[in-house]
Structure formats: C-alpha cells, structure tokens
Design a protein with these regions (language model features):
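N-terminal secretory signal peptides
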Residues: 1-32, 44-50, 54-56
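Glycan-processing catalytic domains of CAZymes
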Residues: 58-391
Length: 391
C-alpha cells in the first residue's frame, strides 16, 4: 500500500542565475522567440488548438476518483479556488500530452517529480486508510518520469538523501515498473563511489542515471565525474528508450556565450541531452544550434529534450509582460520563494488563460519547442499542486 503525502520540495535557496548578473534579464518578445526558433525550419506550422484540447475540456476515460490525495479539505484552501489541485494537474498533463502527440506521436512527454500523481488512493468499506491504484490515464500520457535526489542531495549537495525519502521514491518506482515507463534519476553528488552505489540500487529498474556537479542543485554545468558518460556508445539513438545515459543542463549562464554553451554540449557523447531552449533563460536556441546539438561527438544522432516549467510563471521568460504582478492577470499568484532560480510566480495552472501560454497553438511555448525540433519535453512544476494544497 502506498503512503500518500504531499510532495516535499528540497530547500533550494533562490539565486537569480538565469540572468547571469543577479538581475532580471530583459524579456524576449513572442515575435522574437518565433523568429529565432523557426529560423531555417521548413514545413507546416503547428495548427491552432482544436476544440476540447485544454484540460478543462477533457473527457475522462474513467470516472473521477474518490481520492484521499485531495488533502485535508478536499483540495480547498482558505482564500484559494475550490479545486481538486491534484486532479487538475493530472488533466493538464494529459491535455499537453494529447496535443503534442497529435502532431508527433513519438514526442516524449516526461514528468519531473510529482510521483504522487501516478496513483489514486481509494477508500474501501474495509480499509479506510486507502488502497493505491495506478492513475491509468495520467500514466498513459507519460513516456518517462524523472526523479531528483533519490540517493544524494535531497537536502544538501553531496549528502545522502534520508533513508525514508529514498524508500518512498523507490517504492513508487517499483510499483510502477509494470506501467512501461522509462525512469531517469538525477542525484547531486560528484563522488564516484556514491554514484556506483546509487546505480546498483537502480539496476532492477533499468533507470538512466546522471550525477549533477556542483554548485548546489543549479544544474549549470556538465558532470566531470565520470569523465565519460555511463554506458557511452557509438549507436544511433532515435528515442529515449534506446538511450543508455543522459545529461541535464538547465542554466547555461556559466558558459558565457550561446556558442560556447552549444559547443560544450555538442562535444559530448551523451545519448540524451535535457536542456533549456533558451541560453541564460532569454536567448532562444536556433535551428542551426539544434543541428549542432543533434549529433554526439561520435557523429551519431542523439535525443534532445526541452525543459519546460508548466506551472509557474518565470519572470525572465519571453511571455512575461512588464505590468504583470501577483493578481494581475488573475491567474498569476504570489512569488515562489522556493524557486530553483528565483524570479518565479505561482499560477492558476488549471486556467485556460495560463494553459494557452504553455501549449495548444503554434505560438505557445511548447509549440515553439516542437517547431525547433526537440524530441520531447521535460515538464517541471508538476508538483506545484502541493503548494496549493498546503498554502
């Protein structure tokens, strides 16, 4: 039986590294993003959203669950909208997946954390504690799940994750093995012995493993240990299931220029690269950049996955407008004090207005990511439901 709880965020101190100089960078306009991302890219643009594509319009495959995960007040927080925040997030992710895969069926949809969304807790007549059942529709929408710090770095870089947390994470992954999902694990350590221990514990789960280097949990450089990727190979990698390894670099500011950043990543043999589609959060990658990143150092293709925060508004992104603040527009809430890089606001992620920024038409964030040629998306912010439950 699964123990249900709300996601616990690691205590990351906000540091505005996205700007590289400690101040909020200048916003990139939607037109600039479109122009840069589509440069040199032929073919038809993604169509506008068909009716019923947003999460609010989804017709569920199964009845809504009687879920204990709705929290102590049925998902209602004082002063907050009356919402089942967990089910709203599930519907949102499902809608994103359906829309993306309607244009490219092999587009990989990866959830970052948020393991609690994978199961319902159903009360029964004889067991009021709840019986765990897989959230089938949500799981069908995913190709993979990435978990952070299952063994090292949950609280502080290089320190072992507490045993209870590790057991909790591995318990979910063990139960979900039969669902056919690919697992990716990111630890925060540079100790090779620790990496070997972690990989041994993941062996039965066939998970891809990456140990991010310091500083902290900023994911701002490539790992130096080991010197070559685990399972390095010269093979053609067409999808994430063929990959033996991956690297994850989300803050490129330490590299200086975009060319230096792209060159550093291109000169690796990782089967999969998970990266931000913007250099330093503001300068979009181009089609030419993507062509350079597409091939491993060996010359064979690899998989490129884009990072996308689907549930917090990042103030340095192209979509952020100068007049926005908490409460204006209505779907923007207060600042996220625990953001990985600061400069973020919680949002009403269940609203059509916010979702239309993220996906559903050719000028949406995900629309541009797909036009640029990424093979999939890593969705961050999935565990935002916990903030709304615990507010």
């Amino acid at each position: 039986m699964a123990k249900q709880r709300h996601s616990k965020s690691r205590q990351i101190q906000p540091t505005p590294v996205a700007s590289g100089n400690g101040v909020a960078p200048k916003s990139m306009s939607r037109r600039q993003f479109l122009g840069n991302s589509a440069a040199g890219l032929g073919g038809a643009l993604l169509a506008t959203t068909p009716l019923g594509a947003y999460a609010q319009d989804l017709e569920p495959f199964i009845p809504a669950p009687n879920s204990l995960s709705n929290g102590r007040s049925g998902g209602i927080n004082t002063g907050k909208p009356e919402k089942d925040f967990i089910e709203e997030m599930r519907d949102y992710v499902i809608a994103i997946s359906r829309w993306a895969k309607s244009y490219r069926s092999d587009f990989a949809v990866i959830a970052m954390n948020g393991l609690e969304l994978t199961e319902f807790l159903e009360k029964t007549l004889f067991d009021t504690r709840g019986v765990a059942e897989p959230a089938r529709n949500y799981l069908r929408a995913l190709d993979a799940i990435l978990v952070e710090a299952p063994f090292y770095g949950f609280e502080n870089y290089g320190e072992p994750t507490n045993a209870e947390e590790t057991k909790y994470i591995l318990g979910y992954l063990e139960r979900l093995k039969l669902e056919g999902l690919q697992y990716l694990a990111v630890d925060y350590t540079e100790n090779r012995a620790d990496m070997n221990k972690a990989r041994a514990q993941l062996k039965g789960l066939d998970a891809l493993y990456y140990a991010a280097p310091p500083p902290g949990m900023q994911l701002s450089s490539l790992a130096k240990v080991p010197s070559t990727p685990f399972g390095s190979n010269p093979h053609v990698i067409d999808n994430i299931r063929q990959a033996n390894n991956f690297a994850m670099v989300l803050d490129s500011s330490p590299y200086g220029t975009k060319d230096a950043y792209v060159e550093a990543l291109a000169a690796t043999n990782y089967d999969t690269l998970i990266i931000d589609p913007f250099h330093r959060g503001t300068i979009p990658l181009t089609y030419d950049d993507m062509k350079r990143l597409r091939y491993k150092k060996t010359g064979t293709p690899r998989v490129l996955i884009s990072y996308l925060n689907i549930a917090t508004a990042e103030t340095y992104r192209y979509y952020w407008k100068s007049g926005w603040r908490a409460g204006s527009p209505d779907y923007v809430s207060e600042g996220n004090l625990m953001a990985r890089w600061g400069q973020e606001h919680h949002v009403h992620y269940w609203t059509r207005e916010w979702q239309s920024i993220i996906f559903g038409n050719e000028s949406s964030y995900l629309g541009n990511i797909m036009k640029l040629g990424f093979d999939g998306v890593l969705m961050a912010g999935i565990d935002e439901y916990a903030w709304w439950l615990d507010y």
